[in-house]
């Protein structure tokens, strides 16, 4: 699946047991692919071409794929759901802080958070690395994060098994003290 054009990430949950899993919700003896990017029909074909016989794929996106006899088989998978992230950052600057410093900090945070995978949590303390590596001439005096436009959190953000972090520079507020 990862070799397909446009596919950026894939996570596959497998259930080899006789009992359905609750979270992630994987029926017994099946697998649950979650795919970011790519064309639905190509993804379904790749799953069909590589899945074991008699094992069902699971998900809310279902497409028919023809076997060598022309018989259609339902192939299922999911797409990750975007989880918006908002950051409010308060910094104190000195005379060496560049005029584009705010943009550099925002870009560094967007670059870092865009590397997180499907279901990968946002770890609060790790945000300081891209912030501090963006430029010099400042220090962070406060930071809050969250999933709404007025973030108040100072702890990690849990990302569910089928979610992916969605961040843009406009979701990052930089204030000065």
Where are each of the predicted segments found?
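Carbohydrate-recognition loop of C-type lectin domains
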Residues: 2-120, 176-177
